[in-house]
Curated annotation (Swiss-Prot):
UniProt xrefs under InterPro entries: Amidohydro-rel (IPR006680), DHOase (IPR004722), DHOase/Allantoinase_Hydrolase (IPR050138), Dihydroorotase_CS (IPR002195), Metal-dep_hydrolase_composite (IPR011059), Metal_Hydrolase (IPR032466)
Catalytic activity: (S)-dihydroorotate + H2O = N-carbamoyl-L-aspartate + H(+)
Keyword Cell cycle (UniProt): no
Pathway connected to this protein: Pyrimidine metabolism; UMP biosynthesis via de novo pathway; (S)-dihydroorotate from bicarbonate: step 3/3
Keyword NAD annotated: no
Cofactor, free-text remark: Binds 2 Zn(2+) ions per subunit.
The protein's name: Dihydroorotase
Sequence positions that bind Zn(2+) 2: D154, H181, H234
Length: 429
């Protein structure tokens, strides 16, 4: 446990300013000052940040820890260690597990395991319906009382409008968000990548943009009618951005997220049968990606979430038609985004950090997270903004190495992550 972080750079009023941070034995921040003189207490341990960025720990509203049911892909331990490696101190896990925690007993067990078996604060979404695919709603008030951060069938869109309408009514009544994977399965037609030039060239079925935007349009009207907080997962199309922008202007209680891979890649990258580029929703067109950047800049898109989705090497070694959707992202998100959006792009560091700290804390109602404040628990990430590093699978804490970004050189690697003052990750020297 570190009791003092010295020589850090905090972002204050869009400027990096030298600050020291003192932490007490309970893991709470006791002082943030230009200079804090170390005491002579033998329990005090000092971390010299050496001019690195010291930030509030990042918040990821969309991770898949695969535990229980798919522990060959990930476990609570490895998934949370991967999050800590990426500078995340709070995450919200998806319920597409085996068994699906759609009964109160299983859900309570999972919440308890999240609290005792993970390296970071791990919150849990509950399913909207039984088994994620039927039309029987879970007991939302009971699940919220048991700790549900919201309700989602992630991995599946809610296909029946009446089911979604009733779910939104119940969620609105208990002030809980509906977190939607938006996908009209009747329009997907077995697609594996975006329905565009790459799909035609590779002769594989494509997923049309309207499979996303059609369900978004439906759900916006249901959200308007019910007043629920409606949050859209991993948006990918320019049509969705336009729909969300219009809905926000109309006063609909709507938020949304975008992933790093949808910001950084498009379907021009798919030149072969490369399953590291297979995810759901798929990589769309350059025009879609440009719209995502614009939406992130103007506030239409609220937060960045990784959709960290580990799979085994054997699964991802199959063809595009057979391999599962998804890539890992927890360990690379900040460094990739800092390098491409800030250093080589139009975003400021303040804008990037807001989308990964303060705004997700607001969107997901985590008032103790997302800021560095005296009296709060010391959830802290330290990033080296000047030293280039190469993304290597051998450095990953996750069981999953399925990412197209292996080998890329980035800035912004994680030096240290503290969760409630305890070391969750520290880079080896």
């Amino acid at each position: 446990m570190y009791r003092l972080i010295q020589n850090g750079q905090l972002l204050i009023d869009d400027q990096l300013v030298k600050r020291d941070i003192a932490i007490d034995e309970k893991g709470r921040i006791t002082a943030i000052e230009a200079q804090i003189t170390p005491t002579d207490e033998p329990t005090e341990t000092i971390f010299d940040a050496q001019g690195a960025l010291v930030s509030a720990g990042l918040i990821d509203g969309h991770v898949h820890f695969r535990d229980p049911g798919f522990t060959d892909k990930e476990t609570l331990q490895t998934g949370s260690q991967a999050a800590a490696h990426g500078g995340y101190t709070s995450v919200i896990a998806m319920p597409n597990l085996n068994p699906v925690p759609d009964n109160l007993s299983d859900f309570k067990t999972l919440v308890a395991r999240n609290q005792t078996e993970t390296s970071v604060h791990t919150y849990q979404f509950a399913p909207i319906t039984g088994d994620l695919v039927n039309n029987d709603l879970v007991d939302m008030p009971a699940f919220k009382a048991a700790g549900a951060a919201g309700f989602t069938n992630d991995g599946h869109g809610v296909q029946d409008a009446q089911t979604m309408y009733l779910a939104m009514q119940q969620a609105a009544a208990i002030d809980a968000p509906i977190v939607a994977h938006v996908e009209d399965i009747s329009l997907v037609n077995g697609g594996v990548i975006h329905d565009g030039a790459a799909a035609k060239r590779l002769n594989v079925p494509g997923i049309p943009s309207v499979s996303e935007s059609a369900q978004v349009a439906r759900d916006i009207e249901l959200a308007r009618a019910t007043g629920v907080h409606y949050h859209i997962c991993h948006i990918s199309t320019k049509e969705t951005v336009a729909l969300v922008r219009r809905a926000k202007a109309d006063g609909v209680n709507i938020t949304c997220e975008v992933t790093p891979h949808h910001l950084l890649l498009d379907d021009r990258s798919i030149i072969s049968d490369d399953t590291m580029l297979k995810m759901n929703p798929p990589l769309r067109t350059l025009a879609d990606r440009q719209s995502l950047w614009a939406g992130l800049m103007d506030g239409t898109i609220d937060v960045i979430a990784t959709d960290h989705a580990p799979h085994t090497a054997a699964e991802k070694s199959q063809s595009l038609l057979q391999a599962p959707f998804g890539i890992v992202g927890s360990e690379t998100a900040f460094s990739l985004l800092y390098t491409h959006l800030v250093v080589n792009g139009p975003f400021s560091l303040a804008q990037l950090l807001a989308k990964m700290t303060t705004v997700p804390a607001q969107v997901f109602n985590l008032p103790a997270a997302g800021q560095l404040r005296v009296g709060d628990q010391a959830d802290i990430a330290v990033f080296n903004l000047t030293q280039p590093t190469t993304i290597q699978a051998t450095d990953f804490q996750s069981k999953g190495h399925n990412t197209p970004f292996i080998g890329e050189t980035v800035l912004g690697g994680t030096e240290l992550t503290l969760v409630a003052g305890q070391v969750a990750y520290q880079r080896s020297k």
